[in-house]
């Protein structure tokens, strides 16, 4: 790339920075005064004319200034050499705030609230997807001799509790045997494999001559409940925070704010964007029509995945106007995702 192209990119970068900060169209005189571009106002005007002709900036209404287009923002983001990481104090504060969450729900609620505050955008966090989860532990508790509580804990920290009504009461020895059998069948397996294993266990034991009818019945009833829990309870869940941040920037959406809010409420578009995040640590920025959703055409969506030990739990990110502090948003999304994974990975 020649020096003229490099210089024009510096002009574009200055226009993006000033427009994000001020919301005002940027003129050549303002750029020369605010930035050490090393060239005259006339040269900057010429560079702006080229940038406009190539579709990187545009002139809104009758203003003398220019604003970035989607293409301009994309060029700016693609050429971010290095996103400045958060300070050690900021990182410690994020980790401490998330670590005090008492369970998965609390950690994710804290994360979405924190990310919305840090970015001043709408924050979105996807609950760990069940399809990628494994059973960490199964606990079986006798509420009464004929009524059991099954507690399934996944490696992502998700906890599901189910009640099993038995046909016949079982004693302490049979309860311990039931706990061992179910635990051996489930623990360490992906949820889909675990559901098959527990179903096979029930089938195998139903005709076992060494198994009491009461215990075989308890295994069968427990297996039915567990299969429903592991396989059928697969709805995707999203947490949203900071929706009010969008209403503070209504002008940025050009009358499309209602459709953005409707898309967030319906969740389908957001879940599709998050589902594309398969690599923790990689941040994806979709600008305007890159979201491939007409309702979101006036937005930018910054997403990543969170997880632990190389395993992705789910996606997260922010939704805001295209007039966004991209370097700061990318840094905050990456940091919060990293520490969600750390916190959940140690539980």
From Swiss-Prot:
Gene3D superfamilies: 3.30.450.40, Heat-inducible transcription repressor hrca homolog, domain 3, Winged helix-like DNA-binding domain superfamily/Winged helix DNA-binding domain. Transmembrane segments: none annotated. Keywords: Repressor, Stress response, Transcription, Transcription regulation. InterPro entries: GAF-like_dom_sf, HrcA, HrcA_C, WH-like_DNA-bd_sf, WH_DNA-bd_sf, WHTH_transcript_rep_HrcA_IDD. GO terms for molecular function: DNA binding. Pfam families: HrcA. GO terms for biological process: negative regulation of DNA-templated transcription. Belongs to the HrcA family. PANTHER family: HEAT-INDUCIBLE TRANSCRIPTION REPRESSOR HRCA (PTHR34824:SF1). Negative regulator of class I heat shock genes (grpE-dnaK-dnaJ and groELS operons). Prevents heat-shock induction of these operons. This is Heat-inducible transcription repressor HrcA. The lineage of its organism: Bacteria, Bacillati, Actinomycetota, Actinomycetes, Mycobacteriales. The gene is hrcA.
């Amino acid at each position: 790339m020649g020096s003229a192209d490099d210089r024009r990119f510096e002009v574009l970068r200055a226009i993006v920075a000033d427009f994000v900060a001020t919301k005002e169209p940027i003129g050549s005189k303002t750029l020369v005064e605010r930035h050490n571009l090393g060239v005259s106002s006339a040269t900057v005007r010429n560079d702006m004319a080229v940038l406009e002709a190539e579709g990187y900036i545009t002139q809104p209404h009758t203003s003398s200034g220019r604003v970035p287009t989607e293409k301009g923002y994309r060029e700016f983001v693609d050429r971010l050499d290095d996103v400045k990481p958060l300070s050690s104090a900021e990182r410690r504060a994020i980790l401490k705030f998330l670590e005090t969450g008492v369970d998965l729900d609390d950690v994710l609620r804290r994360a979405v609230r924190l990310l919305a505050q840090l970015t001043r955008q709408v924050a979105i966090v996807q609950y760990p997807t069940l399809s990628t989860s494994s059973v960490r532990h199964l606990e079986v508790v006798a509420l009464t001799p004929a009524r059991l509580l099954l507690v399934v804990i996944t490696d992502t920290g998700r906890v599901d509790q189910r009640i099993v009504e038995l046909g016949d009461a079982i004693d302490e020895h049979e309860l311990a045997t039931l706990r061992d059998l179910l635990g051996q069948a489930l623990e360490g397996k992906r949820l889909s494999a675990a559901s098959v294993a527990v179903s096979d266990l029930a089938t195998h034991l139903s005709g076992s001559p060494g198994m009491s009818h009461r215990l075989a019945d308890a295994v069968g009833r427990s297996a039915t409940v567990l299969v429903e829990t592991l396989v059928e309870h697969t709805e995707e869940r999203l947490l949203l925070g900071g929706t009010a941040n969008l209403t503070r920037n209504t002008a940025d959406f050009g009358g499309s704010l209602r459709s953005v809010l409707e898309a967030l409420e319906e969740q389908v578009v957001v879940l599709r964007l998050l589902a594309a995040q398969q690599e923790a640590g990689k941040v994806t920025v979709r600008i305007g029509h890159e979201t491939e959703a007409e309702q979101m055409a006036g937005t930018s969506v910054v997403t990543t995945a969170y997880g632990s030990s190389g395993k992705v739990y789910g996606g997260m990110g922010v939704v805001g106007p295209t007039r966004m502090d991209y370097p700061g948003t990318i840094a905050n999304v990456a940091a919060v995702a990293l520490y969600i994974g750390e916190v959940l990975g140690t539980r």
